[in-house]
Amino acid sequence: MGKSQSKLSQDQLQDLVRSTRFDKKELQQWYKGFFKDCPSGHLNKSEFQKIYKQFFPFGDPSAFAEYVFNVFDADKNGYIDFKEFICALSVTSRGELNDKLIWAFQLYDLDNNGLISYDEMLRIVDAIYKMVGSMVKLPEDEDTPEKRVNKIFNMMDKNKDGQLTLEEFCEGSKRDPTIVSALSLYDGLV
């Protein structure tokens, strides 16, 4: 993507129509908004964290925003360009449940080894708890990140090896109504 393009080329537009769940008009609107907010055509980690802070003013979303940024930044160059942004937005807002679960798995799999360790899950859940702050009243069996992660691993880690495969994560998530509802949070919003 060029730095100061005001419109997507026809080739770029066709490519994005094929790889997202947005139509041409929506893509052009998102593109315009992206460049209005990011005139350089790139969003860096600190800018991304500032955006999250606006949505979670009563907590500290910086760690969680960093984890999300790392999944959005598909080519790992330290910036999110429009294509990376719109592809991730497409999955999180309009994707099928399985697509969302794969995306969420990538979020939790911090070292990208194809497994989610207890520690990786704990780091993400801890970041989520810090982000929501005191806004959410949690049940007693989930009122600390450790309790929540223990509950998740007890439910999902079928072979009890201390790590979750993609299959274990997807199957377990589908059985947990709180995970399914969290993954459906943005449905229909964009």
Curated annotation (Swiss-Prot):
One GO molecular-function entry: 1-phosphatidylinositol 4-kinase activator activity
Gene3D superfamilies named in the record: EF-hand
Result when mutating E84Q: Growth defect at high levels of extracellular calcium
Lipidation (N-myristoyl glycine): G2
Biological process (GO), any one: phosphatidylinositol phosphate biosynthetic process
Domain EF-hand as annotated: residue spans: 40-58, 60-95, 96-131, 144-179
Residues annotated for Ca(2+) 3 binding in this entry: D157, N159, D161, Q163, E168
Membrane topology listed for this record: Peripheral membrane protein
Residues bound to Ca(2+) 1: D73, D75, N77, Y79, E84
One GO CC term on file: plasma membrane
Alphabetically ordered keywords of this record: Calcium, Lipoprotein, Membrane, Metal-binding, Myristate, Repeat, Sporulation
Domain of life the protein comes from: Eukaryota
Function: Negatively regulates sporulation perhaps by controlling Ca(2+)-dependent desensitization of git3.
Misc: Binds 3 calcium ions via the second, third and fourth EF-hand.
UniProt record similarity statement: Belongs to the recoverin family.
Protein name: Calcium-binding protein NCS-1
Natural source organism: Schizosaccharomyces pombe (strain 972 / ATCC 24843)
